[in-house]
Amino acid sequence: MSKTKTFEENLQDLETIVNKLENGDVPLEEAISEFQKGMLLSKELQKTLQAAEKTLVKVMQADGTEVDMDD
């Protein structure tokens, strides 16, 4: 059973992929595969950040209703 990785773990994985690709000593097939993994990680990280932003822009009023902070 695999556990879901945290935002920080996914970010570290993405940084590892970027560093590997920046070094340039990766065979083409592996570079393409790593690039695809990196793109998937990037999308997942973006979704996590967007969800966090939605949570942070709302505040609870005393009566329990939510108010958008960007109004």
Curated annotation (Swiss-Prot):
It is found in: Cytoplasm. Its main location: cytoplasm. Disulfide bonds: none annotated. Pfam families: Exonuc_VII_S. Signal peptide: none annotated. One of its GO terms (cellular component) is cytosol. GO terms for molecular function: exodeoxyribonuclease VII activity. GO terms for biological process: DNA catabolic process. SUPFAM superfamilies: XseB-like. Keywords: Cytoplasm, Exonuclease, Hydrolase, Nuclease. Its EC number is 3.1.11.6. InterPro entries: Exonuc_VII_S, Exonuc_VII_ssu_sf. It catalyses: Exonucleolytic cleavage in either 5'- to 3'- or 3'- to 5'-direction to yield nucleoside 5'-phosphates. Belongs to the XseB family. HAMAP family: Exonuc_7_S. Bidirectionally degrades single-stranded DNA into large acid-insoluble oligonucleotides, which are then degraded further into small acid-soluble oligonucleotides. Heterooligomer composed of large and small subunits. This is Exodeoxyribonuclease 7 small subunit. It comes from Streptococcus pyogenes serotype M1.
